[in-house]
Swiss-Prot record:
Keywords: Angiogenesis, Basement membrane, Bromination, Collagen, Disease variant, Disulfide bond, Extracellular matrix, Glycoprotein, Hydroxylation, Repeat, Secreted, Signal. Belongs to the type IV collagen family. Changing residue 1690 to T: Risk factor for ICH; results in a significantly decreased extracellular-to-intracellular ratio of COL4A2 and COL4A1 proteins, indicating interference with the proper secretion of both these proteins. One of its GO terms (molecular function) is extracellular matrix structural constituent conferring tensile strength. PANTHER family: COLLAGEN ALPHA, COLLAGEN TRIPLE HELIX REPEAT. Prolines at the third position of the tripeptide repeating unit (G-X-Y) are hydroxylated in some or all of the chains. Residues 26-183 form a propeptide. It comes from Homo sapiens (Human). Alpha chains of type IV collagen have a non-collagenous domain (NC1) at their C-terminus, frequent interruptions of the G-X-Y repeats in the long central triple-helical domain (which may cause flexibility in the triple helix), and a short N-terminal triple-helical 7S domain. Type IV collagen is the major structural component of glomerular basement membranes (GBM), forming a 'chicken-wire' meshwork together with laminins, proteoglycans and entactin/nidogen. Canstatin, a cleavage product corresponding to the collagen alpha 2(IV) NC1 domain, possesses both anti-angiogenic and anti-tumor cell activity. It inhibits proliferation and migration of endothelial cells, reduces mitochondrial membrane potential, and induces apoptosis. Specifically induces Fas-dependent apoptosis and activates procaspase-8 and -9 activity. Ligand for alphavbeta3 and alphavbeta5 integrins. GO terms for cellular component: collagen type IV trimer; collagen-containing extracellular matrix; endoplasmic reticulum lumen; extracellular exosome; extracellular region; extracellular space. This is Collagen alpha-2(IV) chain. Glycans are attached at residue 138.
Length: 1712
């Protein structure tokens, strides 16, 4: 019992003992009461009172009360010892003992753990604003954020394209009484009519019009010498602009001495004492030869760069409030044409006011009708042709009759041919009525004249009421008024107050709630017709109506009014390409380009004399005196044609005109006297002209023409004597337009002009300065504006930066076949062709002579199994095997015999835990826990109550400039402005040159222009049709592109074995292991058939180590040429081209830039044998040549049997293949025959020789904006740019054709390393296969080739040592490497317009002959990693690999049966050397190899920087702790990357040759990942996500870390490139205040990611890892530039501010 139980049981026991004692006493007493006593007198009877009788004893009475407690009895005798009881329960804890004496002083204990962090202090005041930091480097690309919420409804898009024409509707009959009420819509323009029949001969025409002015007469003879003229008056003009550079003068006479120049005034000038004016800019000199200068010092940081590209997509913001409803969206893309719908309900009754004019829509032209029956008698015909003149009876003088009457006005004649020369300007017309007010022009420049201040004007009339202002802000809520109650029923009404000041206009209020419906109002006045409404939404289709009554219409209704605009149709399919459009109007001047000024161009050649200009504007009156009367001029040219002839007979009836034309439309005349097009009736297109009628009789002679233009000037006459000064002459003729003079002085203001017509909108003004951000109050973006008129060609832009390569243009349609050209000149011999396929077997030749000893043969195929050999000798003992894996659990053993008694056992384990104790005292506060995960997003709270009005805040700082708003819609025209004030004198001031006038009419064909500048590159033309075969060899071509690499050579002599490589990686569990050791050699087996093509697998192999170069093989003899191959299959038929009509020769076009390189043309037929060409230039070094053919021809072989038909190959992948290697250049075809029609745009030709410099053409139009240039790598980080506008997503272009090879560039410096790629997803581990059934022992197999590496097998028995084999022969030379990377990128072409044009492949050309092998080419630079190749055929099993490193135990497989032990096989032949790996980075020398360690701080293996080989990967070890001492690892050295992980990777040994593993509290520390912090220590597989991975890379140079001690990224030294950026990690401590640190020059001191706890502690004894509270990391901090001023101030940083105080670093490697 417990202590408490015994305390309770004591009093109860005593009560039971007392009760028992009383009971025993009463029992004894009652027993004695029934006993008769005979030893007393009278035998117990009382005889004293006479005889008494005693009745029987009564029943037992009730128990009496409890008696008093009896005394304790004496102790009883000692009983026998009882049986030993069971062990009692553990007793209660005893009372605390007496405090013992004070003990001795104990030994000094170890240092305690650091205490918990103190309570954070209050945040200090914010420091002053720091200096702007350096621009940070680009961060690593973040993971894509979650998908954001759907955006608000977009703005209305532009209207969609017009839908397709609908199907013809069902006819509907109208009753006769309703036909007049409806009219049909105006029909669309009719189709082009068929050509009409020839008209009847016309009547005699009227007198023709005045003839055109005659051509200018020939130059007159030189005039006689004039008289001496008067001296003219002149003003000293303003200095003109500098004239053009004149043509070179004749060479002067060389002079040895300087002759003084004697001026007319007698003053002598010495040329050597005076400096002439600055000459014109000289021509460029010849190209100089410069030596490479020394490397300059590092420049200052550049200016702030332009805004960068758009940043990465940010994290999604919170869901915004619902936006305003957008405008109606654009029509969707055109859908497919729907099926015919159900017949609609009957339409409304038609209405036609005139039944006779009722006309329906114009139908389609019908088919020709059948031959009709003969018609009825027709009406009288038109008058016949005039008869011949009648005979005359009178005299000859009287034969001519009187003139007839004037005929009626003739029809309008056809437009005449353009006049060769313009007529003289007509007289000034009458002044037109004032035009409407023009649109407000752009603000003019500030004036220069300042007038005197005028007198104060009178008070003006009241102005027009202004437009209502913007609504003002809402006022503050007023205080509550006091309520004053009055005694009476009504309050006394006060007097009206004074009017208050005018309030500001309020802002637009929030829309009020919908009011109650008002009472109906009175009928209002009829309103004006409303504007055309917006088309409503398409309603839901109504129910199908009942079929209407059928009615018949006999007359065709009139064309009705235009119907309501229909619902926009769905977007139609892409139409066929239209014809070329007409030339567009010249656009407005474009904005000036922003290129930098280019270098001066070469001087142009002298231009040809220009044509005579048109007369200039009327100049101001001259100041000369009137001249003398001139002499009579020469006779003028022929006059204009005479008056119109007589009226002819009426022509045939015209086509009926359109009805409902608006006859009130007037045609306004524009500024250049051109007719402006106004909306009127749209007629059909003009029909084809009829056949010409017979000529009419000759008209009367025309009137005398106006005098012709003056002839060309005659030669100059001899110079006359100077005349006297003349009087003021009449105004001279207008002069030619002179060059534009410099800006004159500001004149006086001119008089008031009459209001001009509405001007065109002015050009865009210069961009204004950035305005303040406007307040947007409920504004919405306007609709998209109309497209502007195309601008006029701008000035030639400066050369832009080099753009990126353009998109690949679409493949064009085949061109029309050209005509056969004349035979060309013979060309040079062609380049060697590609190797053709092997020829067919030839006829057996005569046996040749015995040849020399051939090369070593290729290893033969596997032979048949040989006979079993004799058992070999027992070999020497083999090497000690590796530690085997744990064996499988054995079967249960037999029951053992009874053992002897064991020795006493050890102390037992502790018992089970006791019951929970009482609640302990409150402990000391714990440390801050780790930061919790962010909670889920809470629900929105209830709206709070309205707060009281706050105080006015202080004005805020000036806000940042807002992003540019969307372009607003065009505003309404403003109210007319006040008339201008015209001061006297203004009329005499000529204004500045006005804006460009409206576009003139299209001019006639001008004279041939001078040669212009090269045009912008044309788009890629469509390929032409295949050309006709040429017969003449082409001219010598350019140097060809390097040939494709040759076929693999024959194996060379085997090289010596390479050095032992590093251990390979631990692969995942492989398939079933390769066969056992090789058997005996078998005989050579028969040749097997080719196997099927294996599957494709996209796993690239790891590059092997580069083997040593093999010895050069013996060159083989030259082989024979193969015979011609079999004819190929017939290709697909090409598209038949349309034969073009021969057109007139086109004008000579301007020279364009070289076009993009088109696709190669089809191969022409063989040309005729040409003359021997000249020797070509040395070609590029070709790829490595083919190896020579084998030795002399052997004995002829028999013809083989035809092979069986192969199975169809697996379908190819559905992706575009890589572009093939360039084919050989085709031979040049014959010149084509002349063609007069301009052909389609041809494929750009090959690059021609450099032409002579052209003359300077007019400025070109501004080029399209180029793509952003490729940003060169830079060590200097730019400042962050402003946020750019988001770009639109472009369509994916087709792959462009390969550009021409660029010119050889100077060797560039090595670029920076790119950002690390995203880690790949780890592959899934395959399942272990089941063990197969036990097989019988097989025959001795042939030696297999090397197979894939199997997983580690169970440890076998130690075999006998085999005999040492002979050294194998030197391996053959390895295969050639992969093709090198493409050459430098050429100049970028224009971005092509991606189009999807379906093309058909052309016909396949005949196969070329096999060319000789080219010379070996230079080794190209290392290409980028290629796409994963297709899976090769399964390889043969290779020899057994070396023993691998002890691997982690794999999954336990199923237990297989025990196989028979096989015999020991002989040693297999050495395998062939493997294929060479990809070329590595160039090393500095063979003896130098640097190692670079990269830690990912994630659970993914990091990638080595580009060009570096990965040697191994593993886990990031920071340091060990053993015997309470730390051993640190440098994270920049390879020792910090252990290939395998264990919580206890080491053991310790004592001097007694005894080692212990995981037997004490030793620890290992590893770099950790970003996995969430665990609450408890993790063990086993849970550890892996917390351990950082690492890779050891082979670097060509040493890598160092540089630290900025600032928040900015430091720069690498000059000549070094960046590998990664990070944070400066200094040192670390953990348990027992032990730890270590990093060398600040080591890359290990620059971790890419910052964590307050970057490493995790693993306990070796327990096998667990955890983040304990005593781990500290130490980092370099940011230090201000004033290093020695003031002491550091203590500070505590929370999680969000830590990175602002951590120094940044960068790991750099020297460029080689």
């Amino acid at each position: 019992m417990g202590r408490d139980q015994r305390a309770v049981a004591g009093p109860a026991l005593r009560r039971w003992l007392l009760l028992g004692t009383v009971t025993v006493g009463f029992l004894a007493q009652s027993v004695l009461a029934g006993v008769k006593k005979f030893d007393v007198p009278c035998g117990g009877r009382d005889c004293s009172g006479g005889c008494q009788c005693y009745p029987e004893k009564g029943g037992r009475g009730q128990p009496g009360p409890v008696g008093p407690q009896g005394y304790n009895g004496p102790p009883g005798l000692q009983g026998f010892p009882g049986l030993q009881g069971r062990k009692g329960d553990k007793g209660e804890r005893g009372a605390p003992g007496v405090t013992g004496p004070k003990g001795d002083v104990g030994a000094r204990g170890v240092s305690g753990f650091p205490g918990a962090d103190g309570i954070p202090g209050h945040p200090g005041q914010g420091g002053p604003r720091g200096r702007p930091g350096y621009d940070g480097c680009n961060g690593t690309q973040g993971d894509s954020g979650p998908q954001g919420p759907p955006g608000s409804e977009g703005f209305t898009g532009p209207p969609g394209p017009q839908g397709p024409k609908g199907q013809k509707g069902e006819p509907y009959a109208l009753p006769k009484e309703e036909r007049d009420r409806y009219r049909g819509e105006p029909g669309e323009p009719g189709l082009v009519g068929f050509q009409g029949p020839p008209g009847r001969p016309g009547h005699v025409g009227q007198m023709g019009p005045v003839g055109a002015p005659g051509r200018p007469g020939p130059p007159g003879p030189p005039g006689p010498k004039g008289q001496q003229g008067n001296r003219g008056l002149g003003f000293y003009g303003v200095k003109g602009e500098k004239g053009d550079v004149g043509q070179p003068g004749p060479n002067g006479i060389p002079s040895d001495t300087l002759h003084p120049i004697i001026a007319p005034t007698g003053v002598t000038f010495h040329p050597d004492q005076y400096k002439g004016e600055k000459g014109s800019e000289g021509e460029p000199g010849i190209r100089g030869i410069s030596l490479k200068g020394e490397e300059g010092i590092m420049g200052f940081p550049g200016l702030r760069g332009y805004p960068g590209l758009s940043g990465e997509k940010g994290s999604p913001g919170q869901k915004g409030s619902r936006g305003l409803d957008g405008y109606q969206g654009p029509d969707g893309p055109r859908g497919p044409k729907g099926e015919a719908g159900d017949p609609g309900p009957p339409g409304l009754p038609a209405y036609s006011p005139h039944p006779s004019l009722a006309k329906g829509a114009r139908g389609d032209p019908g088919f020709p009708g059948a031959q009709g029956e003969p018609g009825s008698q027709g009406e009288p015909g038109d008058p016949g042709l005039p008869g011949p003149p009648g005979l005359s009876i009178g005299d000859g003088d009287q034969r001519r009759g009187l003139p007839g009457e004037m005929g009626p006005k003739g029809f309008i004649g056809d437009p005449g041919i353009p006049a060769l020369y313009g007529g003289p300007p007509g007289p000034d017309g009458k002044r037109g009525p004032p035009g409407p007010p023009g649109l407000p022009g752009p603000p003019g420049p500030d004036g220069f004249l300042f007038g005197l201040k005028g007198a104060k004007g009178r008070a003006g009339f009241p102005g027009l009421p202004g437009s209502p202002g913007a609504r003002g802000p809402k006022g503050w809520k007023g205080d509550a008024g006091e309520c004053r109650c009055t005694e009476g029923d009504e309050a006394i009404k006060g007097l009206p107050g004074l009017p208050g000041p005018k309030g500001f206009a309020g802002i637009n209020g929030e829309p009020g709630r919908k009011g109650d419906r008002g009472d109906p109002g009175q009928h209002g006045l009829p309103g004006f017709p409303g504007l055309k409404g917006v088309p409503g939404n398409i309603g839901a289709p109504g129910p199908k109506g009942a079929k209407g009554d059928s009615r018949t219409i006999t007359t065709k209704g009139e064309r009705g009014q235009p119907g309501v605009p229909g619902v926009p149709g769905m977007k139609g399919d892409d139409g066929s390409p239209g014809r070329d459009g007409l030339d567009g109007f010249p656009g407005l001047p474009g904005p000036p380009g922003d290129g930098i000024k280019g270098p001066p161009g070469d001087p142009g050649y002298p231009g040809i004399p220009g044509t005579k200009g048109t007369p200039g504007e009327m100049g101001p009156p001259g100041l000369g005196l009137p001249g003398l009367k001139g002499q009579r001029g020469f006779p003028g040219d022929a006059g204009l044609p005479g008056p119109p002839g007589f009226l002819g007979p009426p022509g045939p009836a015209g086509t009926p005109g359109q009805i409902d034309c608006d006859t009130d439309v007037k045609r306004a005349v524009g500024g250049d006297r051109q007719e402006a097009i106004q909306p009127g009736c749209i007629g059909g297109p003009k029909g084809l002209p009829g056949l010409p009628g017979p000529p009419g009789p000759t008209g009367a002679k025309g009137l005398r023409g106006i005098p012709g233009f003056a002839g060309a000037d005659g030669g100059p006459g001899p110079r006359g004597l100077p005349g006297d000064a003349g009087r003021e002459g009449f105004p001279g003729p207008p002069g030619f337009i002179g060059p534009r003079g410099s800006k004159g002085a500001v004149g006086l203001p001119g008089p008031d002009g009459s209001p001009g017509p509405i001007g065109l909108p002015g050009p865009d003004g210069p961009p204004g300065e950035r305005g303040l951000p406007g307040e947007v109050l409920g504004a919405q973006p306007g609709p998209r504006g109309d497209a502007g008129v195309p601008g006029q060609p701008g000035l030639k832009g400066l050369p832009g930066d080099r753009g990126p390569p353009g998109f690949r243009g679409s493949q064009g349609m085949p061109g029309m076949p050209g005509l056969k050209g004349q035979p060309g000149l013979p060309g040079p011999s062609g380049q060697p062709g590609l190797y053709g396929p092997p020829g067919l077997h030839g006829f057996p030749g005569a046996p040749g002579q015995e040849g020399p000893l051939g090369l070593p043969g290729i290893p033969g195929r596997e032979g048949l199994p040989g006979d079993r050999g004799d058992p070999g000798d027992t070999g020497a003992p083999g090497p000690v095997g590796m530690k085997g894996l744990s064996g499988d659990r054995g079967d249960a053993g037999f029951t053992g015999e009874q053992g002897h008694p064991g020795s006493p056992g050890f102390k037992g384990i502790d018992g089970m835990p006791g019951t929970p104790g009482l609640k302990g005292d409150r402990g000391s506060p714990g440390m801050d826990g780790f930061q919790g995960m962010p909670g889920l997003k809470g629900r929105p709270g209830f709206p709070g109550s309205k707060g009281e009005a706050g105080f006015f805040g202080i004005p805020g700082l000036k806000g940042l400039a807002g992003e540019p708003g969307f372009k607003g819609s065009r505003g309404d025209p403003g109210p007319p402005g006040p008339p201008p004030v015209i001061l006297p004198g203004m009329k005499d001031i000529k204004g500045e040159k006005g804006d460009e006038g409206p576009m003139g009419l299209k001019g006639y064909l001008g004279a041939k222009g001078i040669q212009g500048m090269p045009g912008i590159p044309g788009l890629s033309g469509i390929p032409g049709l295949p050309g006709r075969p040429g017969h003449i060899k082409g001219v010598k071509g350019d140097i060809g592109v390097p040939g494709i690499p040759g076929l693999p050579g024959f194996p060379g002599v085997a090289g010596p074995p390479g050095i032992t490589g590093f251990p390979g990686f631990i692969g995942s569990r492989g398939d079933k292991g390769a066969p056992g050791r090789a058997g005996l050699y078998g005989e050579i087996g028969a040749t097997g058939d080719f196997g099927d093509i294996g599957d494709t697998i996209n796993l690239p192999g790891r590059p092997g180590l580069k083997g040593e170069r093999g010895t050069t093989g013996i060159p083989g003899l030259k082989g024979f040429f193969g015979e011609k191959g079999t004819e190929g299959d017939i290709g697909f038929p090409g598209i038949t081209g349309v034969t073009g009509v021969q057109g007139p020769p086109g004008l000579k076009g301007q020279t364009g830039f070289p076009g993009l390189t088109g696709p190669p043309g089809s191969q022409g037929e063989l040309g005729r044998i040409g003359l021997p060409g000249g020797k070509g230039d040395d070609g590029w070094p070709g790829a490595p040549g083919l190896p020579g053919f084998p030795g002399l021809r052997g004995i002829r072989g028999l013809h083989g049997l035809p092979g069986t038909k192969g199975f169809p190959g697996s379908p190819g992948s559905d992706i575009h293949g890589d572009p093939g290697f360039p084919g050989p250049p085709g031979e040049r075809g014959d010149p084509g025959e002349a063609n007069t029609l301009p052909g389609p745009v041809g494929v750009p030709g090959q690059k021609g020789d450099q032409g002579a410099p052209g003359e300077r053409g007019p400025p070109g139009s501004p080029g399209l904006q180029g793509f952003p240039g490729i940003t060169p790598p830079s060590n200097i980080s730019g400042a962050p740019g402003d946020k750019g506008a988001p770009g639109i997503f472009g369509l994916k272009g087709y792959r462009g054709p390969p550009g021409p090879p660029g010119s050889a560039a100077l060797p560039g410096s090595k670029g920076d390393t790119g950002n690390p790629g995203a880690p790949g997803t780890p592959g899934t581990k395959g399942w272990a296969g089941d063990s197969g059934p036990q097989g019988r022992p097989g025959v001795f197999g042939l030696p297999g080739e090397k197979g894939p590496r199997g997983e580690q097998g169970f440890m076998g028995n130690t075999g006998p040592t085999g005999a040492v084999g002979d050294r194998g022969p030197k391996g053959p030379k390895g295969d050639p490497g992969f093709p090198g990377a493409p050459g430098t990128v050429g100049a970028p072409g224009i971005a092509g317009i991606p189009q999807k044009i379906a093309v058909q492949p052309g016909t396949v050309g005949p196969q070329g002959r096999r060319g000789p092998p080219g010379a070996p080419g230079e080794m190209g630079p290392q290409g980028p990693p290629g796409e994963p190749g297709f899976r090769g055929a399964p390889g043969k099993a290779g020899p057994q690999g070396r023993g691998g490193v002890s691997a982690v135990p794999g999954f336990r497989g199923d237990e297989g049966p025990i196989g028979h032990q096989g015999p020991i096989g002989q040693e297999g032949a050495p395998g062939r050397p493997g294929s060479p790996g990809l070329p590595g980075m160039p090393g500095r020398s063979v003896s130098i190899g640097y190692l670079l360690v990269k830690h990912s701080q994630t659970d993914q293996e990091p990638m080595c920087p580009v060009g570096m080989n990965k040697l191994w990967s593993g886990y990031s070890l920071l340091y060990f702790e053993g015997q309470e001492k730390a051993h640190n690892q440098d994270l920049g050295l390879a020792g910090s990357c252990l290939a395998r992980f264990s919580t206890m990777p080491f053991l310790y040994c004592n001097p007694g040759d005894v080692c212990y593993y995981a037997s004490r509290n030793d620890k290992s520390y590893w770099l950790s990942t970003t996995a969430p912090l665990p609450m408890m220590p993790v063990a086993e597989d849970e550890i892996k996500p917390y351990i950082s991975r690492c890779s050891v890379c082979e670097a060509p140079a040493i890598a160092i870390a540089v630290h900025s001690q600032d928040v900015s990224i430091p720069h690498c030294p000059a000549g070094w490139r960046s590998l990664w950026i990070g944070y400066s990690f200094l040192m670390h401590t953990a348990a027992g205040d032990e730890g270590g640190g990093q060398s600040l020059v080591s890359p290990g001191s620059c971790l890419e990611d910052f964590r307050a706890t970057p490493f995790i502690e693993c306990n070796g004894g327990r096998g667990t890892c955890h983040y304990y509270a005593n781990k500290y990391s130490f980092w370099l901090t940011t230090i201000p530039e004033q290093s020695f001023q003031g002491s550091p101030s203590a500070d505590t940083l929370k999680a969000g501010l830590i990175r602002t105080h951590i120094s940044r670093c960068q790991v750099c490697m020297k460029n080689l």
